[in-house]
């Protein structure tokens, strides 16, 4: 949520910056609503003052033995007018709030201006894609050939865009999540958290999934009242970031760095027909999430650090990747600046996103009222929040299967994972 004061005082600037994201702000309508709000506010306060002044005269009139029925009627009439104005004001404020909740974050000045993903800017590459001297397979053929990926059973049990993993591939998938958690907690300074996979509406509003992206979520309909309105998490960013909702942390506690390995659930409502085969776009997938809560002056540096933490996973696994900074038209709703990390997939002969690392600045914190107490003046100030995948486990599995495949259909296990696989060096 944007700063209301900045929005009111810099409406034209806000509209101009939001336009670079493809969001057209109706300045005229918002200005009209603001004028109406001011007018109703003044009218309400004047009526309240008049009612209070007349109310005081009732006691005086009674003391003089005068009839107060007319005065009482006048007070009642003014009270009705106050109530009516309050209702009008509440309706205007509700509309203003709905508009404010629909606005994406303002892009950082360092984010390149562009309309879509074709105008994202590559900032670096790591590793060289492997040259194969045999016909390569994609992860689907490799996984099915190794009896480790069972798409048919998943369709029978649930439906499309789900997977059943078996044997050593299931073990490899588990090893990846454990490896990522160990790296981030022992070397990068994150605290591991175990979090609920079901969250309430307030949590989703806080991190920005609601109200805009409700159709992308899976919502529960329990038989009992307890649990009504819960939704499956689309990312562990939601529960991790909401740990500081409606709270004030001490400045000495910052930065707070959290990580969790969870299943994530997305309906993929807007991606019909995209990546219909394989593990790239699933309704249920595992992800290791990284969240940082920092002071405002530290957030841009924290974004670089967090992105590096995600990149380190790929480097340790020996997987080629590139990092791009997203243009304004391709950034997520709550982000002010985002880096996407894209891993090389030989089966698709291209780089595909495996992590998205974003600085939300105070956008989420304002929604959540997540603050810290500034030591200098002992006053609360909004935190800056950051998040990123460290990494998407399923897509990392895809990258390993395709990059480490052998001519006979077997897959070599990266050295960094062998201790998690009981010393196994190859699957198949």
Swiss-Prot record:
Its EC number is 6.1.1.11. This is Serine--tRNA ligase. Gene3D superfamilies: Bira Bifunctional Protein, Domain 2, Serine-tRNA synthetase, tRNA binding domain. Pathway: Aminoacyl-tRNA biosynthesis; selenocysteinyl-tRNA(Sec) biosynthesis; L-seryl-tRNA(Sec) from L-serine and tRNA(Sec): step 1/1. It comes from Shewanella sp. (strain W3-18-1). Catalyzes the attachment of serine to tRNA(Ser). Is also able to aminoacylate tRNA(Sec) with serine, to form the misacylated tRNA L-seryl-tRNA(Sec), which will be further converted into selenocysteinyl-tRNA(Sec). Homodimer. The tRNA molecule binds across the dimer. The lineage of its organism: Bacteria, Pseudomonadati, Pseudomonadota, Gammaproteobacteria, Alteromonadales. CDD domains: SerRS_core.
